[in-house]
Amino acid sequence: MMMALYSIAPASTPELEIAALQKELAGLPAGERIAFWAERFVGTPYDEYPLGEYVRKNVVVADERVDCMYLTFRTVELALGTDPGDSRRIALHLRFLHRGMVENGRVVNYEDRFQYGEDMIESGKWGREITSEIGENSTVTGPSGKSATFVPAGLISQSPGSFRSGDIVFFVNPPEKMAGGVIVGHIGIIKKETDKIYLIHASGKKERGGSVKKVLLGDYLSIMPFEGIKVTRFPADVQMPE
C-alpha cells in the first residue's frame, strides 16, 4: 500500500478525511495503524488540565490538547475503528473499567474510566502483556506494598525483533515515587522504521505544558526518570466487541 505522509493532528482534520484514512489503512495490521495515528499527533500541545480536557468537558473527542493517557486512548480508538463513529463506540469500551455511557452527547460516567496505566494492563483490554519478551524481568515494590514486574531500563532489548509498531509502553515509577501505589508514571507508543525504534509520547507536565514528540527510544531510555517498562501488544487482527 502506498501511503502519503500525514502530519496534521486529528484536531484539525475533518471527520470525512479521518474516515477516508481509516478506510485506506484497513488492510494494515493493528499495530501499524496504531503507530500511524500516534504519529499524526506529533506536535499537538500537551493537555495541562489536571484531569484531562476530555474529562473536564465530559466528551469522547478532545484532540486539541492531549496527555499521555488520552493520546493512548485516542490513537488506539482511531486505529481500531472503521469510521469516526465506530471509534467513538470503541472508546466507550476501551477507556472504562466497565463501559462508558453517553447522554445528550456527553459522557456521564468518567469516574469509571481507567486512571492508572497498571489497571489498563491488568484489564486485558489494551492487548497482551509482552513484558517478559522485551528483556529480563525484575520486581519492584512501592511503599504501599503494591508490586510490579517490569524490565529494568538497562535490560531493555532494542534488537530488531524486540518491539513492533503499535506496542504500548508503560513506564514504571521508581519505588520512592509510587505514592498511593501508582505503578505506571507515563505511557507511550512504539513506531518502527527499518532498524530504528521510536517512541511517540505526550511529553510535558500538568500546568506547565509540552507537546507530543517522536524520539528514538534509546535516547529517551537514557534520560528518563523511570525504573523500567511494561509493554502490551494488540493482535494484528484484533476485533472489538459490539
Label each residue range with its predicted role.
Residues 37-38, 72, 134-136, 153-156, ...:
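Generic detector of short, locally flexible boundary/turn motifs and exposed helical patches
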Residues 137-178:
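A mid-sequence, solvent-exposed acidic-amphipathic segment
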Residues 1-6:
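Bacterial N-terminal signal peptides
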Residues 65, 162, 177-184, 192:
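Short amphipathic alpha-helix initiation/capping segments at coil-to-helix junctions
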Residues 165-168, 174, 185, 190-242:
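Low-complexity, Gly/Ser/Thr/Pro-rich intrinsically disordered linker/tail segments
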